Regions:
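P-loop NTPase catalytic nucleotide-binding module
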Residues: 1-22, 41, 96-185
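P-loop NTPase switch module centered on the Walker A-proximal segment
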Residues: 2-101, 144, 150
């Protein structure tokens, strides 16, 4: 394989942060699947794997190289968190939609805020029967105010989950769990 050389304007270093068990590693695996780097998604939300060290996942998409840094969620690995944050230009904070607002989420938001790292929040596991998107959104807004502004909202809840609605561009994506694919509606 020939290694491609990228201009620095076409490289993005993005940290994946969140509370332990929120689905950070599964999110990266899903991104690899979407980019065609994996033939299937093997992660299971019931898996109890713990990320204990930084891992780098390079994904090329539409001419840009995205270096996703999977950062541990346990406070025991704070040195790894510090190292990961020093290397990123932006962050995706993964929030578990089946729980209340967690310490790991709050820590990720505070750490990225203190370093002026641009970030967005991804509410994960919203297709789970225990998920409550509105509750977690309300908790985030209560704690962080108007800085929490959804671009996408869940379409349905629990077993009635159908997909997400893009409230900026006004379209919906419906998820077919049986085929593991989305379609714009």
């Amino acid at each position: 394989n020939v290694m491609r050389i990228y201009d620095s304007s076409n490289i993005r270093n993005i940290g994946i942060l969140g509370h332990s068990g929120s689905g950070k590693s599964n999110m990266v695996e899903g991104l690899e699947f979407t980019a065609g780097l994996a033939s299937r998604i093997t992660g299971n939300e019931n898996d109890t794997k713990i990320t204990s060290s930084l891992s780098l996942h390079a994904i090329e998409y539409q001419g840009t190289k995205y270096n996703f840094v999977d950062i541990p969620g346990y406070s025991d690995f704070f040195g790894e968190v510090e190292s990961g944050l020093a290397a990123v230009d932006g962050a995706i904070i993964i929030v578990d939609g089946t729980t209340d607002l967690t310490v790991g989420t709050e820590t990720a938001l505070e750490l990225t805020d203190s370093r002026n790292i641009p970030r967005f929040i991804f509410v994960n596991k919203i297709d789970n029967e225990k998920a409550d998107y509105e509750k977690i959104l309300s908790q985030l807004r209560e704690k962080y105010g108007k800085r929490i502004a959804p671009f996408h909202v869940a379409w349905g809840k629990g077993d009635g989950f159908r997909g997400h609605i893009n409230v900026v561009d006004m379209f919906a994506r419906e998820f077919d769990k049986g085929k593991n694919e989305c379609k714009t509606v």
